[in-house]
């Protein structure tokens, strides 16, 4: 009987699992709606008083999105003011709802990935995950890897969808231009 050879294991394909990059930590949406006057406008003095009295330490180590769920007049500086109070405590702060927070967190972590370790490699980005990896993370990852990889695939090493193959270097035909 002949020995069974695992061709997938010996293929040299590197599996990259975005789920392994999933940053652990609580996600929190800071909603400005309760701070609005009659749910239509924000008063600067009221917001500043709130910011002065609020316990910002409760956001320590958390991923925070500053958002307003009401259709109201909220100036840009209000989001910035809250961010200046949250940022010293939070692991990450951005503007948006829960979905936008997740996309922003993944974008940050994908951009921190050391893509050089994938130079000239055959990479398959794992497709199945138990955690909510946002679609933009896959797109961002593709953009990061494309300049360095030999090939990029999606799925599992035993069943991949080819996405990209680096062009082969052109050979010098031996003749020189005159």
Where do the model's predicted regions map?
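Long, charge-dense
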Residues: 78-117, 155-160
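A domain-level signal for the structural core that forms small-molecule/cofactor-binding pockets
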Residues: 47-52, 127, 136-137, 144-145
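Extended, charge-rich low-complexity interaction segments
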Residues: 115-140, 177-178
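Short active-site-adjacent structural elements
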Residues: 74-75, 103, 132-136, 161-165
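N-terminal, charge-rich interaction modules
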Residues: 1-74, 79, 83, 90, ...
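Short glycine-rich or small-residue beta-strand-to-loop segments that form or flank ligand, phosphate
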Residues: 63-69, 94-96, 122-128
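A generic local secondary-structure boundary/capping motif
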Residues: 4-5, 54, 112-115, 142-143
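Short, non-transmembrane amphipathic alpha-helical segments
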Residues: 81-87, 137-146
């Amino acid at each position: 009987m002949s020995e069974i050879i695992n061709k997938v294991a010996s293929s040299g394909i590197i599996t990259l699992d975005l789920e392994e990059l999933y940053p652990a930590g609580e996600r929190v949406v800071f909603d400005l709606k309760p701070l609005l006057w009659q749910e239509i406008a924000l008063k600067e003095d009221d917001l500043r008083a709130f910011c002065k009295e609020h316990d910002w330490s409760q956001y320590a180590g958390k991923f925070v999105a500053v958002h307003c769920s009401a259709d109201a007049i909220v100036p840009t500086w209000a989001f910035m003011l809250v961010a200046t109070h949250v940022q010293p405590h939070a692991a990450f702060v951005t503007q948006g709802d829960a979905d936008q927070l997740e996309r922003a967190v993944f974008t940050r972590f994908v951009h921190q990935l050391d893509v050089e370790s994938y130079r000239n490699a055959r990479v398959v980005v794992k497709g199945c995950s138990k955690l909510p990896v946002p679609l933009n993370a896959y797109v961002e990852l593709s953009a990061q890897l494309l300049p360095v990889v030999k090939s990029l695939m999606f799925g599992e090493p035993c069943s991949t969808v080819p996405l990209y193959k680096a062009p082969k270097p052109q050979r010098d035909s031996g003749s020189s231009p005159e």
